[in-house]
Protein backbone atom coordinates (compact mmCIF):
# COMPACT_ATOMS: atom_id res chain seq x y z
CA UNK A 1 0.00 0.00 0.00
CA UNK A 2 2.78 2.43 0.89
CA UNK A 3 4.54 1.71 -2.41
CA UNK A 4 1.33 2.43 -4.34
CA UNK A 5 0.84 5.61 -2.36
CA UNK A 6 4.39 6.65 -3.18
CA UNK A 7 3.85 5.96 -6.87
CA UNK A 8 0.73 8.14 -6.82
CA UNK A 9 2.47 10.94 -4.91
CA UNK A 10 5.47 10.99 -7.25
CA UNK A 11 3.15 11.29 -10.24
CA UNK A 12 0.64 13.82 -8.85
CA UNK A 13 2.25 15.86 -6.05
CA UNK A 14 5.35 17.93 -5.45
CA UNK A 15 6.26 17.35 -1.81
CA UNK A 16 8.76 19.60 -0.06
CA UNK A 17 8.91 17.93 3.37
CA UNK A 18 7.93 14.73 5.18
CA UNK A 19 6.99 14.23 8.83
CA UNK A 20 6.13 10.95 10.50
CA UNK A 21 5.35 9.44 13.83
CA UNK A 22 8.49 7.84 15.27
CA UNK A 23 6.68 4.52 15.64
CA UNK A 24 8.22 1.91 13.35
CA UNK A 25 5.23 1.21 11.10
CA UNK A 26 4.69 4.89 10.29
CA UNK A 27 8.34 5.54 9.67
CA UNK A 28 8.51 2.54 7.31
CA UNK A 29 5.37 3.74 5.51
CA UNK A 30 6.88 7.20 5.07
CA UNK A 31 10.08 5.66 3.72
CA UNK A 32 8.23 3.56 1.11
CA UNK A 33 5.90 6.44 0.17
CA UNK A 34 8.78 8.85 -0.45
CA UNK A 35 11.25 6.48 -2.11
CA UNK A 36 13.12 8.34 -4.82
CA UNK A 37 12.06 11.79 -3.59
CA UNK A 38 15.34 12.49 -1.78
CA UNK A 39 13.56 13.89 1.27
CA UNK A 40 14.55 13.39 4.89
CA UNK A 41 11.85 11.99 7.14
CA UNK A 42 11.38 14.27 10.13
CA UNK A 43 10.00 12.45 13.15
CA UNK A 44 7.69 14.16 15.63
CA UNK A 45 6.56 12.54 18.87
CA UNK A 46 3.36 14.58 18.63
CA UNK A 47 2.26 12.45 15.68
CA UNK A 48 2.18 9.20 17.70
CA UNK A 49 -1.02 7.21 18.03
CA UNK A 50 -3.25 7.56 21.08
CA UNK A 51 -1.67 5.84 24.07
CA UNK A 52 -4.06 3.29 25.57
CA UNK A 53 -1.90 2.64 28.63
CA UNK A 54 -2.76 -0.66 30.32
CA UNK A 55 -5.03 -1.55 27.40
CA UNK A 56 -2.37 -0.99 24.71
CA UNK A 57 -2.31 -4.56 23.34
CA UNK A 58 -6.09 -4.95 23.10
CA UNK A 59 -7.96 -5.01 19.82
CA UNK A 60 -10.30 -2.13 19.05
CA UNK A 61 -13.25 -4.55 19.22
CA UNK A 62 -12.20 -5.63 22.74
CA UNK A 63 -11.99 -2.02 23.86
CA UNK A 64 -15.48 -1.38 22.55
CA UNK A 65 -17.07 -4.55 23.92
CA UNK A 66 -15.25 -5.16 27.20
CA UNK A 67 -14.62 -1.62 28.36
CA UNK A 68 -17.08 0.51 26.34
CA UNK A 69 -14.03 2.69 25.83
CA UNK A 70 -15.00 4.23 22.52
CA UNK A 71 -18.41 5.40 23.73
CA UNK A 72 -17.02 6.60 27.04
CA UNK A 73 -14.10 8.48 25.47
CA UNK A 74 -16.32 10.08 22.84
CA UNK A 75 -18.88 11.11 25.45
CA UNK A 76 -16.19 12.48 27.77
CA UNK A 77 -13.08 13.74 26.00
CA UNK A 78 -11.22 13.67 29.34
CA UNK A 79 -11.84 9.91 29.87
CA UNK A 80 -8.79 7.68 29.42
CA UNK A 81 -7.76 4.07 29.74
CA UNK A 82 -5.76 3.36 32.91
CA UNK A 83 -2.34 5.00 32.39
CA UNK A 84 -3.41 6.13 28.91
CA UNK A 85 -4.32 9.34 27.13
CA UNK A 86 -7.71 11.01 26.80
CA UNK A 87 -8.97 12.37 23.48
CA UNK A 88 -8.32 15.85 24.86
CA UNK A 89 -4.68 14.99 25.56
CA UNK A 90 -4.26 13.45 22.11
CA UNK A 91 -5.82 16.54 20.54
CA UNK A 92 -3.47 18.88 22.38
CA UNK A 93 -0.42 16.85 21.35
CA UNK A 94 -1.33 16.19 17.71
CA UNK A 95 -2.64 19.68 16.97
CA UNK A 96 0.56 21.15 18.46
CA UNK A 97 2.57 18.92 16.09
CA UNK A 98 0.57 20.10 13.07
CA UNK A 99 0.95 23.74 14.16
CA UNK A 100 4.71 23.20 14.52
CA UNK A 101 4.88 21.76 11.01
CA UNK A 102 2.74 24.59 9.64
CA UNK A 103 4.98 27.24 11.21
CA UNK A 104 8.10 25.73 9.62
CA UNK A 105 6.81 25.79 6.04
CA UNK A 106 5.61 28.38 3.55
CA UNK A 107 1.94 28.46 2.59
CA UNK A 108 2.69 27.16 -0.91
CA UNK A 109 4.63 24.10 0.28
CA UNK A 110 3.13 20.62 0.28
CA UNK A 111 4.06 18.62 3.36
CA UNK A 112 3.42 14.89 3.73
CA UNK A 113 2.46 13.79 7.24
CA UNK A 114 2.38 10.07 8.04
CA UNK A 115 0.62 9.28 11.30
CA UNK A 116 -2.05 7.01 12.77
CA UNK A 117 -5.81 6.64 12.39
CA UNK A 118 -7.05 7.91 15.74
CA UNK A 119 -4.41 10.64 15.97
CA UNK A 120 -5.32 11.95 12.52
CA UNK A 121 -9.08 11.63 13.10
CA UNK A 122 -8.74 13.61 16.33
CA UNK A 123 -6.73 16.33 14.56
CA UNK A 124 -9.29 16.59 11.75
CA UNK A 125 -12.10 16.79 14.31
CA UNK A 126 -10.35 19.63 16.12
CA UNK A 127 -9.54 21.54 12.93
CA UNK A 128 -13.09 21.26 11.58
CA UNK A 129 -15.19 21.29 14.77
CA UNK A 130 -12.91 22.79 17.47
CA UNK A 131 -13.29 19.61 19.51
CA UNK A 132 -11.90 16.07 19.39
CA UNK A 133 -15.34 14.64 20.23
CA UNK A 134 -16.27 14.02 16.57
CA UNK A 135 -13.16 11.95 15.83
CA UNK A 136 -15.37 8.93 15.16
CA UNK A 137 -16.81 10.69 12.09
CA UNK A 138 -13.44 10.33 10.36
CA UNK A 139 -12.40 6.77 9.53
CA UNK A 140 -9.08 6.72 7.67
CA UNK A 141 -7.87 3.66 5.78
CA UNK A 142 -4.20 2.66 5.86
CA UNK A 143 -2.23 4.67 3.29
CA UNK A 144 -5.26 6.74 2.34
CA UNK A 145 -4.72 10.38 1.45
CA UNK A 146 -6.29 13.26 3.31
CA UNK A 147 -5.37 16.72 2.11
CA UNK A 148 -6.13 19.91 3.96
CA UNK A 149 -4.93 23.45 4.43
CA UNK A 150 -4.28 24.83 7.89
CA UNK A 151 -5.58 28.34 7.47
CA UNK A 152 -7.60 30.30 10.05
CA UNK A 153 -10.57 28.36 8.64
CA UNK A 154 -9.08 24.97 7.68
CA UNK A 155 -10.10 23.59 4.31
CA UNK A 156 -10.33 19.86 3.54
CA UNK A 157 -9.62 19.09 -0.12
CA UNK A 158 -9.85 15.31 0.17
CA UNK A 159 -10.58 12.89 2.98
CA UNK A 160 -9.66 9.20 3.17
CA UNK A 161 -9.02 8.92 -0.56
CA UNK A 162 -7.73 5.46 -1.41
CA UNK A 163 -8.49 4.90 -5.10
CA UNK A 164 -4.71 4.83 -5.73
CA UNK A 165 -4.45 1.64 -3.68
What do these predicted regions represent?
Residues 1-28, 80-95:
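Loop-to-helix element that buttresses phosphate recognition and phosphoryl-transfer chemistry
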Residues 5, 39-42, 50-61, 103, ...:
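Acidic, low-complexity terminal tails and accessory targeting/binding regions
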Residues 28-34:
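Short Gly/Thr/Asp-enriched flexible loops that form oxyanion-binding sites at enzyme active sites
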Residues 32, 122, 126:
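Active-site signature of alpha/beta-hydrolase-fold catalytic machinery across serine-
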Residues 35-95, 149, 157-158:
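Phosphate-handling substructures
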Residues 107-117:
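Generic beta-sheet signal
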Amino acid sequence: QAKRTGKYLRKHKSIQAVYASPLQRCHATAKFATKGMELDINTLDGLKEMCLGDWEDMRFSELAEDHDFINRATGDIHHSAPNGESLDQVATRVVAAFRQIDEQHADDETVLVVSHGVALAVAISVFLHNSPARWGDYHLNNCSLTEFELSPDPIVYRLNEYAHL
